[in-house]
UniProtKB/Swiss-Prot annotation:
Organism classification: Eukaryota, Metazoa, Echinodermata, Eleutherozoa, Echinozoa
Location of this chain's protein in the cell: Cytoplasm, Cytoskeleton
Naturally occurring in which organism (per UniProt): Paracentrotus lividus (Common sea urchin)
Gene3D superfamilies in the cross-refs: Helix hairpin bin, Tubulin/FtsZ, C-terminal domain, Tubulin/FtsZ, GTPase domain
Function: Tubulin is the major constituent of microtubules, a cylinder consisting of laterally associated linear protofilaments composed of alpha- and beta-tubulin heterodimers. Microtubules grow by the addition of GTP-tubulin dimers to the microtubule end, where a stabilizing cap forms. Below the cap, tubulin dimers are in GDP-bound state, owing to GTPase activity of alpha-tubulin.
Official protein name in the record: Tubulin alpha-1 chain
Length: 452
């Protein structure tokens, strides 16, 4: 088996976790108490969904997941919510004091009291796996627990499980909507710390998702539940190939192989289509080519940046539902001919395609319409550097005045860590810039006169 362990850190991570597990349960027909009427092999068996759920002898399906937060209120909602019976009480780990939006508290002072309990729990989950494939880590960049504790955890996971892949689903601080003043600090510190430990990081930006909810689903004032359910659909599309049998299945390491050209350039952009309300879906015929085209609209992206300004290094299309390869090839051919998609010149236009016959599931009473087919596009484009540039600029404005820095230093950090992290991110921006430069331009400077 190729099991995956999901780790949900901090408020954002836990709430994304709620949405994801709610959706997985619906997709697999697992009831909130963990029973699965359709499952004939009690206590194990080699079903595809066993990558995400372990089975007890009593036929109960338990998520291979850990929820961690440094303060109890958010996880308490899981403990008392609809799915309280799904999780083992020890999978829900909480501390007593908050990280208070402070990376240093999450990473040094408060975080270090919880880290061993968490690793111990993860070790127990890992021991139940026959062939652990890797970890999915859900967190935000802006919060104290999400930034500080996640980076501490990733460092420790690299030590304990060196070769296992680690994928992140991270909430990137939105350009306009801010939940904390110090988000740029936390984001840059956590990115610097986790850069070498993460194999692939899917970023989601709240503002981009707010806009999608407003525009496509006609929700005037989207709540976190609306946002998380949409994120859940994306996570579900990415992990569907691990949980179902399909014609063209992709596994975790396969994503990395196809999306990450250089170890540091591992931030793919996710786009999902169709995001449409039930009222509209009833009147529209969403063909494969339509949903494929929608993926190249910046409006459907999960992070605000414009791929038309950047170049693509890799592109991965994950279809689910009623889709045949012939339609996909036709759709891609059309896009290649008429779209202004620019690939870097050292990477021939390759689209990796995955098809999963399980149609997309929606949460009953949710906002999304039930559709026959959907697609999630993961593309590695140099445009995402815009997101880093925005963040770096905000960091610089505050750090020039050393605003708020004393809170971090007071928790045992050194000021040098700030400048070190900032330099690392400057290097990351530079890396993205260099990757996008045509190799012909780069070589042309050295060798003149070699014209054939």
């Amino acid at each position: 088996m190729r099991e995956c362990i999901s780790i949900h850190v901090g408020q954002a991570g836990v709430q994304m976790g709620n949405a994801c597990w709610e959706l997985y349960c619906l997709e697999h027909g697992i009831q909130p108490d963990g029973q699965m009427p359709s499952d004939k092999t009690i206590g194990g068996g080699d079903d595809s969904f066993n990558t995400f759920f372990s089975e007890t002898g009593a036929g109960k399906h338990v998520p291979r997941a850990v929820f961690v937060d440094l303060e109890p209120t958010v996880v308490d909602e899981v403990r008392t919510g609809t799915y309280r019976q799904l999780f083992h009480p020890e999978q829900l780990i909480t501390g007593k004091e908050d990280a208070a939006n402070n990376y240093a508290r999450g990473h040094y002072t408060v975080g270090k009291e919880l880290i061993d309990i968490v690793l111990d729990r993860i070790r127990k989950l890992a021991d139940q796996c026959t062939g652990l494939q890797g970890f999915l880590i859900f967190h935000s960049f802006g919060g104290g627990t999400g930034s500080g504790f996640s980076s501490l955890l990733m460092e420790r996971l690299s030590v304990d499980y060196g070769k296992k892949s680690k994928l992140e689903f991270a909430v990137y601080p939105a350009p306009q909507i801010s939940t904390a003043v110090v988000e740029p600090y936390n984001s840059i510190l956590t990115t610097h710390t986790t850069l070498e430990h993460s194999d692939c990081a899917f970023m989601v930006d709240n503002e981009a998702i707010y806009d999608i909810c407003r525009r496509n689903l006609d929700i005037e004032r989207p709540t976190y539940t609306n946002l998380n359910r949409l994120i859940g659909q994306i996570v579900s599309s990415i992990t569907a190939s691990l949980r179902f049998d399909g014609a063209l299945n992709v596994d975790l390491t396969e994503f990395q192989t196809n999306l990450v050209p250089y170890p540091r350039i591992h931030f793919p952009l996710a786009t999902y289509a169709p995001v449409i309300s039930a009222e509209k879906a009833y009147h529209e015929q969403l063909t494969v080519s339509e949903i494929t085209n929608a993926c190249f609209e910046p409006a459907n992206q999960m992070v605000k940046c414009d791929p038309r300004h950047g170049k693509y290094m890799a592109c991965c299309l994950l279809y689910r539902g009623d889709v045949v390869p012939k339609d996909v090839n036709a759709a891609i051919a059309t896009i290649k001919t008429k779209r202004t998609i620019q690939f870097v010149d050292w990477c021939p236009t390759g689209f990796k395609v995955g098809i999963n016959y399980q149609p997309p599931t929606v949460v009953p009473g949710g906002d999304l319409a039930k559709v026959q087919r959907a697609v999630c596009m993961l593309s590695n484009t140099t445009a995402i550097a815009e997101a880093w540039a925005r963040l770096d600029h905000k960091f610089d404005l505050m750090y020039a005045k050393r605003a708020f820095v004393h809170w971090y230093v007071g928790e045992g950090m050194e000021e040098g860590e700030f400048s070190e992290a900032r330099e690392d991110l400057a290097a990351l921006e530079k890396d993205y810039e260099e990757v996008g430069v045509d190799s012909a331009d780069a070589e042309g400077e050295e060798e003149e006169g070699d014209e054939y």
